[in-house]
Amino acid sequence: TANMEWADYVTSMKMYNEAVANDNNWNQQIKQSVINAWSNAFDTGNYGPYNDVFPQVDWWDELVKPGFSQQYNVNISGGTNFMRYFASIGYQNDGDIYDLQKQENFDPRNYYRRYNWRSNLDFNLTKTTSLSVNIAGKMGYRNDNFADDVYTRIIAAPTNSFPIKYSDGYWGDGSTAGYNPVCNMNTNGSQLYKTFQGWYDVRLEQKLDFLTKGLKAAAKVSYTSASTTRSSIKTGEIWGNNDFESRNS
């Protein structure tokens, strides 16, 4: 995912003043004293995503990170004249592209983890009788939070209206000045989906060459199982500085 490039606040204010001046809306211009204060903050380094007075937040940089996907697989096979076997175990882990932190009572991170397995056993019970036992399955875990329209909210969030957090520990005040995506994605809860699928079959085969050459009889028993569960924790939605909007589900 490509990073976004943003103009700094001083440049934005100067461009805004130039735009309104072109329309002769002089009374809408930002005061030069405000621009000078911000310019001094940039010159002295007194600004940043956690600065109470001069917040400068690159929401994209704060939230978006490179994602990853991992896959592992192990196979074993072998056997004797009496029995042959094959077994396979796999694991897949798709990580999050958002830089979120696990909370005390829930995990808002987005991820998908899957385990899959397969085992085949073939027995030569006699010269004319064979038995096959096959087992396969997979189990998946998909976790996410309740944030929606994330990309649009990150792009639309104001970069200089409030910090991510104030020095007193409260979240930046998104209730009156916009939306705090770092706060919302980390604090509004999580939901975990668990899925399971299993396949089982047993096949018995008997050669009947004594009746007709190449004739065989076979019997097969199969069973399939599947389940899906969802567990969720939905907190109240925190919009900003000591501002709590209760929303439970």
Q: Which ranges hold each PLM region?
A:
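Extended hydrophobic secondary-structure segments that form protein cores and membrane-embedded regions
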Residues: 216-225
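Carboxylate/His-rich catalytic cores and anion/metal-binding grooves
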Residues: 226-235
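Solvent-exposed, glycine/polar-rich loop segments of beta-barrel outer-membrane systems
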Residues: 235-246
